[in-house]
């Protein structure tokens, strides 16, 4: 049986320094053997125009028959309106929450995002938190947030890349419901450390290309070069993320 490959985080649309259309993403997935990808909207839509962003991701999911899976976004500064936005996105088919506290302008531990995480918990959504921007948008604060919500699966986006990789393993040890993503991380150092750590292991890692900031070919090549037992490779490449999302084990036709 072929290994199911799920890309845990991609951003579609026009960004400040890059862009990725749905068509270009699907072509990249075909070239690299990715079955499904979880898509977040553009930077501006994450920060401000949440409705346009949620419409973009959920429409992409419907148009591809579920090959693309939608993240929902809402700026927590909007208060009750942010929860209404997540409810709308849920009705449209979103299956996870994406948070970028640097873009959205809040501290992970100031309580502002907590109502959104509670919404995710109620709907059994995993929560992606992009990390790597100092001073507050980092692995250890993400782990502290995850500890507040042990019933929620958190994905530590970029695993602190690149200056804060040193904090990624301690963060994963601190919060057992936190998962690292593989984007940018060398397999022979960062990912190898995760895999060898008895408190982490490959079952706590999910593959992410983080397009359009990284390339699908480069990220997948590093995964293919990483020598892992077949069952561990399958978990990293797709089955763990599929489980967090509640997806079927086989990709859609």
Locate predicted features.
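Mid-to-C-terminal alpha-helical segments outside catalytic/metal-binding sites
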Residues: 1-8, 19-36, 202-204, 217-253
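Active-site neighborhood of phospho(di)ester-bond hydrolases with catalytic His/Asp-centered motifs
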Residues: 5-8, 38-41, 71-73, 98, ...
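Histidine-centered catalytic micro-motifs
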Residues: 5-13, 131
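Conserved, mostly hydrophobic/aromatic
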Residues: 9, 29, 57, 61, ...
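Active-site environment of divalent metal-dependent phosphoester hydrolases
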Residues: 13-15, 44-47, 76-80, 104, ...
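A general structural detector for well-ordered alpha-helical segments in enzyme core domains, enriched
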Residues: 24-28, 53-60, 85-89, 112-116, ...
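Active-site gating/metal-coordination segments in enzymes
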Residues: 35-36, 44, 48-126, 174, ...
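Catalytic pocket-lining loop regions of alpha/beta-barrel enzymes
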Residues: 96, 109-206
